[in-house]
Amino acid sequence: MTTQSSSDGRMFTSSIIPVIPDSSPTAAEVIELSSQLSLPSPTSLLDFLSTSTSRGPTRSDTVGDKTQGKEVLDTRPILENSFRRENRVVTGTGGKAATGKRLKRRTESPGNACQSKIHIVSGEQIILGQSRPEKKAAKTKRTKKEDGLINYKLHGRVSKANQTVSRQPETKISAPKECNDTTQPAGNDHINDLDDGLQLEQATQRRFDWTPTKDTTIPVIDLVGDSPSSCEKSLSGMRSTRTMLSNYEFSGVVGTLGGSRSEGTPDAPTTKRPIELLKVNNFKEISGLSDDRQSSITEDSESATSKPRRVKAKNRPKSKLTTITSYATAKYTVVEKSVNLDPVETLLSDEPGKEKSAAKRTSGARCAKPGRKKSTTTEKKNEPPIFKVVHPLEAFKAFGGQELLFGTSSQLANGHSEDQHEQNEGTSHISNSSAFLPLSRSESSSKALSQASLGSGFLKLSSSKNLWSAGARDLTGAVLEIDEIDLSEHRMKPSIFAFQPKAPLGCKADTQIPPQLGEIDSDNSCQKPLAAIDPPEFVTRSETPSEKGVLHKYIVKPTHTNSCSQSGSSISVGSPEKPVQDKPIFNGFTTSELAKKVAAYGFKPIKSRDKMISLLEKCWENRNKAPNSVPKLTPGDGLSKVDEPTKGQSLGPHLQPNSISQKATTQVPKVKPAKRATKSQGVPVSSRRSTSTSKVSRKRTVSPSAILVDDDQTSDSTGDSVPPSRPRQPSKSCTPRDRENTPESFNLPTTPLTIRSGKVPSTVTSSESLPSLYTQITAAIKAQPRLRAFNGVKQPTWYEKILMYDPIQLEDLAVWLNTDGFERIGEDREVWPGLLREWCESKGVCCIWRKQRGARAHCPLVRA
């Protein structure tokens, strides 16, 4: 190998320099120079190979001067950093001057190294030549590398480490292209396979297997072909068409598909369908196969028949449960079982259309009579639990001895029983009769009746008989009596509640006066003795609290003195059978308690608390009233006249004047019976205006013995709100009317006795003439004139104070009403602070007590 160096430092080689790598010593790399132009040195060539083409570490050992050895040492770190290139030797010669030029050329013009290109030929040679125009090919290789062929570099590195340089890169370059060409269509095929697998056709086929849409269309074909199955399934279809189970109960599809699939190999979908098994069983039972035919059935059909039997055994304890769920699912469970079709038909045969159902059954099973006989034997075993669930009468009987699980089912069971309804009506009549007794007595009797007749009573609500009645009542059970009293009021006996507010008192008295009452002789003889009046039919008014437990008497005196002695003819009108009870303080009761009390008296619920209190007070007074009045009518003569008693025998030892004046304010009927009185007796009745012209005449015409009892329960006046009479009006100062104007037949007096408030007696007037104190208080406050200013300060009226939400002192308002307020409106009654507090609470007026200034009074009303 010879080298030539020119004068300018260039080196020319005219021979071939073999390059022998250590990895493959047999192979040889030949570098041919096509021309004698300036070419790079071997070291620069190795650098070029390490950076561009040969990407492996090489080790070069040159034979030459020290400068050439330094060149190798300088290029070694570049070569050793490359990947998998070891012990590569480059043999050649060079001069010192050339080495300096070569380093300079490599550093100054690195593009010259890029001008040489490695041509790979079919042989094991590497030919280096100057090919500057072929730089585009290198760019195309770079662009190919940039296109994403990252595996090209990886495969080149691996192949050059193990194989020859000349042959392996060609195969490895083509290999990744083939891999890329093969992997991409493989990936596309896989994606296409996935796309084909995600189509919804297979899913819809799976859906058609379990959805009942196909089953509903196929039974039409089997109904035409198979007559016995059509009859039986028509009955089942009529029963359960409204539920989802009806779609699974059609046996037409199973009759054909089940027989065909049982002959062949059973598939997985057929074993997973409980519908087919049930329908095969139904087809067998409906067709009426005999015992021999059933024994000849295949094992698949026997296994199919065993499954419904297991379900049948599981459903037996469910049929015994008397719950709402069992009621709702009873008919569906019966229809699902083919064995239970006959008992259902027998139950339906009791209805009017039993002949038609029987005809259908016989026509549908005309060729399967022995099979039906066997089915009836099996049905008799299962009949009692099904009969208890389905048949309502048996279920009602079973409820008596069972502990019910749900309260609602017990309500449905016993709520519509006719016997229970009659029993409730009977107890309502008994409770109505007990309503005429006093409050405590009626409550005790009603509780006893409820516990005796209805079992557990109204408070516990443990019995099923009381659940419907307890739904519309309070905890004490008083509201039920209200409803039943309203419904059965036309069947009630005449009582205090039979007094209608618009009916005349004379009409009611003709039917309600007991036969023991003595009649008055028309020939001016003495009166016959009057027996005691029955408290339930003649209600009396209570006395004031100071007269508790005292029996009072009125002395009845004949109008005209005759052969009978007046002193010996004093007769007691009536005497109560029991002492007067303590009057409860209704203001201290809660609203619920007041509602219960009102319901116990037979009235409808009232929203206003004040109205309930006033109504209860009137009812209590009418019940516990002492017989201090004379009966007003005889069975044929009408009203009897009584006279004022003398000083020695006028009143009982315990009767106080205040009680007499309090009776003067009793309530009177709403409608005047003046027409009847004038027709039967022909006596004119004094008008209201003539009796209320002056206060003096009103005060003088009070007669306690002539006060008539009012039996109306719905008058507006409140018995509790009537205050005791003023001490300046004692009963001794009262003088009776003249007796000369009355006829001798003891009919209505020509000039009736009047009470202190100026009203005519209850036989002539109505309760409208005596308004309630609440309305009178309101009228008096609004009628107050505007006051004059005092020292330049305006004095507001009571009405203006109420409008300005000023606290109203109850004592001051009571004094003003009793002195000035009632006189302006012509009212003689008096009020007290307790009544005014109730009025303020009903009207929403802020009120205070004088002693508790600045605080609202919430304490209950306590009366002395």
Swiss-Prot record:
Residues 307-318 have a biased composition (Basic residues). It is found in: Nucleus. GO terms for biological process: DNA recombination; DNA repair; DNA replication. It comes from the Eukaryota. Keywords: DNA damage, DNA recombination, DNA repair, Nucleus, Phosphoprotein. GO terms for cellular component: Slx1-Slx4 complex. One of its GO terms (molecular function) is 5'-flap endonuclease activity. Residues 1-21, 49-69, 91-113, 161-190, 289-318, 346-385, 413-433, 625-767 are annotated as: Disordered. Residues 685-695 have a biased composition (Low complexity). InterPro entries: Slx4_ascomycetes (IPR027784), Structure-sp_endonuc_su_Slx4 (IPR018574). Phosphorylated in response to DNA damage. HAMAP family: Endonuc_su_Slx4. Forms a heterodimer with SLX1. This is Structure-specific endonuclease subunit SLX4. The lineage of its organism: Eukaryota, Fungi, Dikarya, Ascomycota, Pezizomycotina. The gene is SLX4.
